[in-house]
Amino acid sequence: MNTFLIIDGLNLVRRIHAAQPNENDVNGLDARVASACKKLLKYHQPSHVAIVWDGDATSWRKTLYEDYKKGRKPMPEALAKSLPALKTHLSELNVNSIDAEAEADDVIATLATKLVNNQGKAIIVSTDKGFTQLTHTNIERWDHFNQAYITIEQREEKLGVERTQFIDYLALAGDSGNKIPGVPGIGPKSASELLKIFRSLSNLYGSLEQVGAKQAKKLEEGKQMARLSYKLVQLQTEIPLNANLSQFRLPQ
C-alpha cells in the first residue's frame, strides 16, 4: 500500500517560525523546517511525500463570504520572501512542493481522498481542525508539535458529536479561527446538544417546532448563515492537481 505523507506547508512553517522572538528573523529557518521534515519521514516511513502551500489567488470561500478569515495576522514579510528558497531546499531532501492556487486545504483534501479511493493511505501533517471531516479510516492526521496522532475519536469526544456530524456542528457553532459565522447565539455546547437530538442540520431545520421558542427563533433567523457556514467549512475533494504520484515517490 502506498503511504503518502502530506504536509500542510504554512501550518508547519508558520508555527516553527513563530518560536522566533523577532518575526523578521528567518536565519536558520531552512534548517529547522528541514529537521522537522526529516523527523516526519523517519517516523512515518512513507512511500511518497509532498508539502502543499497556499497560493495567492482569492479563495472561493472569500468570494462567497467577504469576512472569511478576516483579521487574520498576515504572514511576516521576511517569512514570505524566504519561502522560494525554502521550497528549493526541501526539494533537495526529496520533499517536493505542490502550490495551490488559493487554499492548500482543498488540495490536501483532494490528494488524500484520491489516495484512499485507490487503496492508498494518507497521513496529513496539520493541526487544522477542518481536516476532521475527512473520516476515512485510511486518512490519518499527525500533530508534529505534540508528536501525536489526532484521532477521530478524540475529536468526537472534544466536540460532543459523531464523525458524520462534524460539518453540521461547524455550520451551527461556527469557527472563530476562520471567521465562519455559524448561527448567532448558538455556541458549541448548544450545537452539540441539538445534534444529539436531531442528528443532522436538515433534520433540525425540519423540526424547529420541537425546539424551545428562544432557540428556535435564533435558528430561524440564522438559517441563511447556517447554510453559508455549511458551504464554507466543506473541503473540496475534486480540485485539479496537475501532478503525478510518481513525482512524490521517495527513493528506496
From Swiss-Prot:
CDD domains linked to this entry: H3TH_53EXO, PIN_53EXO
GO MF terms, alphabetically ordered: 5'-3' exonuclease activity; 5'-flap endonuclease activity; DNA binding; magnesium ion binding; potassium ion binding
Cofactor names: Mg(2+); K(+)
InterPro entries reported for this sequence: 5-3_exonucl_a-hlix_arch_N (IPR020046), 5-3_exonuclease (IPR002421), 5-3_exonuclease_C_sf (IPR036279), DNA_polI_H3TH (IPR020045), FEN (IPR038969), HhH2 (IPR008918), PIN-like_dom_sf (IPR029060), Xni (IPR022895)
Binding site for K(+): L172, A173, P181, V183, I186
Enzyme class, first EC level, given as a word: hydrolase
UniProt: Mg(2+) binding residues: D105
Domain 5'-3' exonuclease: 162-250
Job of this protein: Has flap endonuclease activity. During DNA replication, flap endonucleases cleave the 5'-overhanging flap structure that is generated by displacement synthesis when DNA polymerase encounters the 5'-end of a downstream Okazaki fragment.
Family: Belongs to the Xni family.
NCBIfam families assigned to the protein according to its UniProt record, in alphabetical order: PRK09482.1 (NF007017)
Protein's recorded name: Flap endonuclease Xni
Organism in which the protein naturally occurs: Shewanella woodyi (strain ATCC 51908 / MS32)
Gene that encodes it: xni
